[in-house]
């Protein structure tokens, strides 16, 4: 924690970084109508638990991974609504009501205030208890024709962020897109190909 809060000297920080493990937070389901986000958690856990290849074993040995469903109540409400009609052709995810009195389906719009218990709990884990180096929020929506949107995002970036955070995000995005290119997997949107800006991401 002292390392994450920059409460130590540079020499102590380097020593701790050498002996510690990076923490990666992967969540899904924040927007309960984006079903892939929650379902990928199950698939990701299965892949990590069942594979024995060198890369997976190295990840499990060197990284602490937190897999978190961040809106199970919303998912249950959406699931119940979707399964309500017995005739499958009449099922849809266009739930007619906002199912949270204050923030609707969109719990992540509360993170700047932390008014709701859900966002307060997540913020406590991310910024007090665990302080992961990577926080990956899996959503489902993105520009038409894309599979995933990620950094680098379009400018301008938020002036309250240290520029090293932005270049660090860009480096993660570069590693992601390079890996996808190596595996011949198109569909990664970035910069102006995405609707997301660096102001919020």
Language-model features and meaning:
Residues 16-20, 57-61, 98-100, 128-129:
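Extracellular/periplasmic catalytic domains that process cell-envelope and extracellular macromolecules
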Residues 65, 70, 79-201:
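Metallocarboxypeptidase
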Residues 35, 74, 143-145:
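Conserved protein kinase catalytic core
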Residues 34-40, 114-118:
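Phosphate/oxyanion-binding active-site loops and adjacent basic polyanion-contact surfaces
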Residues 19-23, 27, 37-78:
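Short helix-loop-beta-strand segments that form the rim/entrance of peptidase-like active sites
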